[in-house]
């Protein structure tokens, strides 16, 4: 990753959102897009320009503090690809055409796939049904996101 920004969720419960410049300069991928509905500014601090330059949005899980801003981000200019487990997409009530459903095979973990310039390794977190952690790599570096993690699995 060329650069990394915490756009929300850092030092607070809610608004989880992390933006990374990757591969091609000026292009982004994002992990999570949560809301904090107890705040007068519930959405992460992401500009419309950043959203329009975001190629991929990876969701760790369905809880609104990690996925609740998705449709607002689409309204503000996100038109990239959503990547998440089918369970996360379903439980988040997201209807969006451009998506990559990350398969979760019970027999094999972690899972690894290549999405253009990004190598994505992901695995279950146990926090909730469909919850995933992500290890995202490009030619400049890598970053790991656990989402919310639970040692004693709930899902």
Residue ranges and their predicted role:
Residues 1-58, 63-155:
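His/Asp/Glu-rich metal-coordinating catalytic cores
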